[in-house]
């Protein structure tokens, strides 16, 4: 269901929108002090704008499957048991807001590895995140949590992590990035707590930023893409806004679903190449081979040539090999990004790589949408959407 049909079915939408305005008038008087309280930084007062008229908002789960444990369910047993019980797993969680007079295509914001949709909601220092920025710009916005994390939950039952009686549904271990790895790997600075001199990272929100990242279980791209395709089937044509590892998932979702009308990708990784045309792995400083994204059949890859794609990359990516893997990976991944764009365009597509320093914007991290200049970065996305005819009003 697209945003236009959603607006049409809600008879009380105008009343709801009025309530949102009245509530917003109250909240706008306190929002600044709340943001400052979150971080202890008076500068966090900036960035909270006027009230927004929202005609519909909510959340739902979509996609996934169900597993049933062998045995017979016995309701008289007091202790928790999987026997004979069914469990929904591998669904996606989406929350959405639809503004008055929404544009034709909603934005679906997809988080990266070890993260959740909270990365789009607000910045670590309490400023408005992309969810609100683009809501203000007239887009319906859907923010998701992948299957197996966040509000979508993960497949675990009664007992050992991920085990349904004697069947291991997901591996019995998790992964998580620590503060030190996060600081260097997301390019806040070359060493822990040593910021790049020109950094745009909101330093007052560092503690909040570390808490954005959560433990993860195995990411299965088929499970994630299945869920994204189910979401797109439900909401209709949309624009995907991806980050980091979800750059690949956005591409695979576009291959799977004709409802993807464009992709804006913030430092995405592992984009696919056609079978037989993937670039060779590249050696890192220590000799470790870093490969490109797994290939897909050419007929699938060609579907990516039918939509506009923009990959946005921040600053402080080394130009020469580095002994620290967290700094090496962005250097090598940038090479693969360039090759992906070249390959799409060689087949007649419309892909572009936007290096922020090339347009005079410096100091951005791996997550430019959270940085101090995220409004400036958002302006570039708005320009791209306008140039590609993706910001038309819904009629």
Residues of each region from the PLM?
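N-terminal cap/lid segment of alpha/beta-hydrolase-fold proteins
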Residues: 40-102
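Short, surface-exposed "cap/lid" segments of acyl-processing enzymes
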Residues: 101-166, 170-185, 321, 327
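Conserved acidic catalytic loop of the alpha/beta-hydrolase fold
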Residues: 221-239
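Conserved alpha/beta-hydrolase fold motif
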Residues: 240-241, 263
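Gly/Ala-rich beta-loop-alpha elbow adjacent to hydrolase catalytic centers
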Residues: 241-250
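A conserved short beta-strand
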Residues: 257-277
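Catalytic active-site module of serine/aspartate enzymes centered on a nucleophile-bearing elbow/loop
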Residues: 363, 367-395
């Amino acid at each position: 269901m697209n945003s236009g049909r959603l607006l049409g079915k809600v008879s009380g939408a105008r009343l709801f929108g009025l309530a949102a305005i009245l509530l917003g008038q109250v909240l706008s008087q306190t929002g600044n002090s709340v943001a400052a309280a979150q971080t202890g930084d008076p500068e966090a007062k900036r960035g909270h704008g006027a009230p927004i008229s929202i005609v519909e908002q909510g959340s739902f789960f979509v996609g996934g499957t169900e597993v049933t444990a062998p045995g017979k369910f016995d309701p008289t047993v007091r202790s928790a048991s999987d026997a004979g019980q069914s469990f929904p797993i591998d669904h996606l969680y989406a929350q959405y807001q639809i503004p008055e007079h929404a544009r034709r295509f909603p934005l679906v914001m997809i988080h990266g590895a070890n993260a959740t949709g909270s990365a789009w909601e607000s910045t670590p220092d309490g400023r408005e995140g992309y969810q609100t920025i683009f809501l203000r710009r007239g887009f319906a916005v859907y923010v998701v949590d992948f299957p197996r994390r966040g509000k979508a939950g993960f497949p675990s039952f009664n007992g050992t992590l991920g085990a349904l009686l004697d069947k291991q549904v997901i591996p019995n271990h998790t992964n998580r990035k620590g503060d030190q790895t996060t600081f260097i790997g997301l390019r806040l600075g070359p060493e822990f707590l040593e910021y790049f001199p020109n950094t745009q990272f909101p330093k007052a929100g560092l503690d909040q930023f570390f808490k954005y990242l959560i433990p993860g279980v195995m990411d299965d791209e088929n499970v994630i893409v299945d869920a994204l395709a189910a979401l797109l089937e439900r909401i209709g044509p949309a624009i995907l806004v991806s980050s980091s590892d979800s750059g690949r998932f956005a591409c695979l979702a576009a291959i799977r679903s004709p409802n993807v009308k464009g992709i804006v990708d913030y430092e995405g990784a592992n984009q696919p190449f056609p079978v037989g045309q993937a670039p060779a792995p590249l050696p890192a400083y220590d000799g470790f081979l870093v490969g490109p994204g797994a290939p897909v059949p050419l007929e699938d890859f060609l579907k990516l040539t039918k939509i506009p794609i923009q990959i946005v990359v921040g600053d402080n990516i080394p130009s020469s090999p580095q002994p620290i893997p967290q700094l090496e990976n962005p250097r090598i991944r940038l090479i693969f990004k360039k090759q992906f764009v070249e390959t799409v365009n060689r087949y007649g597509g419309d892909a572009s790589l936007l290096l922020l320093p090339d347009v005079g914007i410096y100091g951005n991290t791996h997550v430019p949408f959270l940085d101090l200049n995220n409004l400036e970065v958002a302006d570039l996305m708005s320009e791209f959407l306008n140039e590609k005819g993706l910001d038309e009003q819904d009629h």
